[in-house]
């Protein structure tokens, strides 16, 4: 039995009018997105990346911004700190309790007394006292007393050491700075959440991220053009390009690791900052992974060299289809725009969630817990009962504790990233499948791509949501297990080898299941586009077709898809290589591997969208050829196709194409199916659900 059987019928009965599929899953997907939007609103209210990147003073002002929120009872809040991007601590020995202010620059030299502080203010127009303090008071004879220079301000305690900016915080860097003080300052910076630091670096590099993701689209389009015009040698070119790119990115990673390690070993103070140490560790791990992947790719390319010549016919046939349907270039562009908009939205929300905090009152002096003397007659001086005694105990400042209730929403957005990305990919796949199937069976004069898009929006969004959710269902557990395995490996103890082995097995199992389901989904979308059935019945039909033609499937999707996958890797590797060269010397970014990883992943997504065009065209043509061969035998259109090679036949270029069949066809589901059903989709949708 072939892909489809023909079944004679006494009278022609076309299939039912196309109706909506998997409506329940469309409702679930819409509700999920409503939840994402609600979380996004809260993240925009509470999140402020600049508050983490630049820091804030003790009055609630974020440093380096033009407008700040004004709080009642805090007259120094709501200030314009655009020209004051750095945080300065008035007493570096009491970092948790001292007053913080925003300053124009960190001290360029050591300041030892009040007059030197005033001269520095006159020379460099940089004020290291509280905003409302009159600096001319420092010239008074009694200015050197403790009333002006304390951890509560209004001016800093001496000496003020020469400092440099680390994450926009002034940290002593002069030779006279005590080691303990420097360590305490770095410990304070390290106390910021790792997620905050990572997403802060991503926020600072967003123009570079957008630039290189856009560049990945250009690289992918160039690769598509090469697939069309250089079919005879494109397989070799892709393999050579992948080999060069993998070697290049591996060499750059090892060189970056050497430079990072050398700089940390040379300057011991740099080792106090966990971001730089984390950067070194990440580069080291990525360099090892890149080396392993490079070796695997070179071995695979070496063994594929004898089979690459057979792919010319495959890509030539796909190129012929795309040449006759120029509209096929539209779905990848639309998918890229949709993915770019979603990823931009996702990045903004995820950064706001990671930096979410809320204003709170903090007492500066820890004397509010002290009780008043109950026997006031024993006091030498009677207290003034008209004054609130709490004013002598403390005065309040503003701090921003983390909004933990929003931090947990990060997991929902991680699920949303996978599900929505897969949803966009699935929409593209179904549109391409429908357009190619209509072109193969009907050869219409109108635009099959627009027709396929219309049918997707009207009827099949539910099936797309279900198919993408199934992929998510297997991918999320694999990501969680991979994370657990990394933590177990980092803190590996004696006796954990068994757990490590089990995790590896589970990760591999979920990876294999995900790849299998993803491949089955590709073909299920083709059946949905043709027959308008729900996702599960369509997957069953596609599975039967694949099993029946297992040898041909292995040939087409084994070698062809592998070469296309190498092309996606090449685009991602090239963009990752460029991002490393652009970001590794950026002084404002400490954990630069975070944006590098984001750029590489997003570039792979973009390349996957564009290059999956060829993949879907080939898969769809294969299913159509299987049906055509079963229905028409050697007189069908497939006999003139280069795909006949892949079906074990010789193409007949001069064969006369048989007319389109008008008899009822019965697919392997044993349910009636007719070519006429394709024509019925043009009928008014009055019978649709």
Curated annotation (Swiss-Prot):
GO molecular function: transmembrane transporter activity
Chain segments annotated as coiled-coil in the UniProt record: none
Compartment(s): Membrane
Keyword Transmembrane appears in the UniProt entry: yes
Glycosylation site positions: 134, 279, 375, 389
Transmembrane spans: 23-43, 199-219, 233-255, 283-303, 333-353, 412-432, 461-481, 562-582, 591-611
UniProt key word Transmembrane helix: yes
The protein, known as: Choline transporter-like 1
Organism the protein comes from: Aedes aegypti (Yellowfever mosquito)
Gene: Ctl1
């Amino acid at each position: 039995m072939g892909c489809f059987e023909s079944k004679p019928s006494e009278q022609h009965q076309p299939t039912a009018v196309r109706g909506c599929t998997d409506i329940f899953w469309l409702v679930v997907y819409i509700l999920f997105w409503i939840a994402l939007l609600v979380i996004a609103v809260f993240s925009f209210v509470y999140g402020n990346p600049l508050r983490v990147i630049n820091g804030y003073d003790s009055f609630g002002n974020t440093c380096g911004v033009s407008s700040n929120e004004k709080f009642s009872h805090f007259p120094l809040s709501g200030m314009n700190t655009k020209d004051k991007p750095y945080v300065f601590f008035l007493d570096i020995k009491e970092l948790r309790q001292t007053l913080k202010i925003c300053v124009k620059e960190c001290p360029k030299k050591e300041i030892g007394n009040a007059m030197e502080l005033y001269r520095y203010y006159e020379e460099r127009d940089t004020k290291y006292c509280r905003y409302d303090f009159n600096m001319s008071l420092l010239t008074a004879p009694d200015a050197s007393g403790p009333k002006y220079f304390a951890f509560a301000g209004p001016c800093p305690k001496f000496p003020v050491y020469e400092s440099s900016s680390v994450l926009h915080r002034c940290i002593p860097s002069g030779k006279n700075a005590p080691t303990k003080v420097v360590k305490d300052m770095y410990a304070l910076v390290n106390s910021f959440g790792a997620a905050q630091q990572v997403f802060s670096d991503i926020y600072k590099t967003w123009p570079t991220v957008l630039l290189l993701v856009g560049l990945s689209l250009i690289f992918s389009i160039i690769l598509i053009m090469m697939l069309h015009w250089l079919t005879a040698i494109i397989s070799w070119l892709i393999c050579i390009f992948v080999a060069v790119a993998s070697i290049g990115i591996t060499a750059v990673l090892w060189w970056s690791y050497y430079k990072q390690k050398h700089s940390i070993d040379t300057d011991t103070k740099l080792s106090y900052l966990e971001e730089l140490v984390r950067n070194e560790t990440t580069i080291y791990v990525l360099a090892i992974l890149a080396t392993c992947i490079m070796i695997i790719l070179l071995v695979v390319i070496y063994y594929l060299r004898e089979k690459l010549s057979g792919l010319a016919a495959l890509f030539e046939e796909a190129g012929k289809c795309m040449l006759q349907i120029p509209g096929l270039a539209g779905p990848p562009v639309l998918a890229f725009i949709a993915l770019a908009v979603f990823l931009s939205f996702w990045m903004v929300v995820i950064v706001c969630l990671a930096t979410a905090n809320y204003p709170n009152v903090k007492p500066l002096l820890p004397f509010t817990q002290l009780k008043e003397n109950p026997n006031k007659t024993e006091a030498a001086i009677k207290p003034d009962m008209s004054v609130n005694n709490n004013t002598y105990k403390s005065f309040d400042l503003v701090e921003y504790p983390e909004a933990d209730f929003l931090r947990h929403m990060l997991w929902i957005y991680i699920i949303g990233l996978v599900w929505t990305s897969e949803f966009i990919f699935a929409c593209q796949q179904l549109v391409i499948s429908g357009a190619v199937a209509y072109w193969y069976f009907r050869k219409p004069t109108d635009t099959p791509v627009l027709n396929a898009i219309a049918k997707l929006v009207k009827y099949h969004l539910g099936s797309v949501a279900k198919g993408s959710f199934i992929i998510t269902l297997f991918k999320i557990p694999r990501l969680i297990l991979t994370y657990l395995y990394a933590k177990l490996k980092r803190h590996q103890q004696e006796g954990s080898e068994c757990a490590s082995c089990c995790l590896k097995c589970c990760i591999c199992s979920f990876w294999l299941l995900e790849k299998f389901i993803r491949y089955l989904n590709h073909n299920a979308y083709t059946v949905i586009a043709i027959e308008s059935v729900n996702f599960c019945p369509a997957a069953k039909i596609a599975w039967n077709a694949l099993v029946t033609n297992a040898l041909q499937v292995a040939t087409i999707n084994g070698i062809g898809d592998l070469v296309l996958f190498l092309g996606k890797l090449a685009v991602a590797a090239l963009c990752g290589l460029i991002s490393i060269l652009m970001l590794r010397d950026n002084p404002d970014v400490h954990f630069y591997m975070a944006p590098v990883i984001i750029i590489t992943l997003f570039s792979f997504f973009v390349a996957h969208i564009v290059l999956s065009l060829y993949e879907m065209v080939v898969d769809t043509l294969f299913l159509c050829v299987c049906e055509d061969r079963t229905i028409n035998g050697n007189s069908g259109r497939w006999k003139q196709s280069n795909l006949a090679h892949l079906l074990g036949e010789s193409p007949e270029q001069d064969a006369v194409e048989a007319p389109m069949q008008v008899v009822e066809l019965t697919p392997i589901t044993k349910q009636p199916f007719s070519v006429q059903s394709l024509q019925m989709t043009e009928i008014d949708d009055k019978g649709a659900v």
